[in-house]
Amino acid sequence: MPLLRFDVIEGRDEKSLQLLLDTAHQAMVEAFGVPERDRYQIVHQHPANELIIQDAGLGFQRTKDMVIISMTSKARTESQKEKLYALLAERLEKKCEISPDDLMVSITENGDADWSFGLGEAQFLNGKL
């Protein structure tokens, strides 16, 4: 049930975006053990001047290929998060040719009462999920 938002610089073609989304989803399924159909993704494309991501003094060489993944999720362990970060960096580089320097991930955690998948219900609270 994690909700992933991808912020990228505009200009990627549909095939590249789909590969990015598919690759990130597979990494999340493996790292978090969520069901394959537990997929919620949103892409935001920005003009280059509207996306400023520096390196926090870590020496990253950012390019126009940078991707920011913001995730909202129920609580995950530190080891699950570290596995996700590593899988994303490895697989996005291999499959999408996105350098690990161009990847930033942020996870915000929430609880069962913070989700409604429709019908005005909190499915985690009412036992439907």
Curated annotation (Swiss-Prot):
The keyword Isomerase applies. Belongs to the 4-oxalocrotonate tautomerase family. Pfam families: Tautomerase_2 (PF14552). Its EC number is 5.3.2.-. The active site is at residue 2. The gene is yolI. This is Probable tautomerase YolI. Keywords: Isomerase. GO terms for molecular function: isomerase activity. InterPro entries: Tauto_MSAD, Tautomerase/MIF_sf. The keyword Oxidoreductase does not apply.
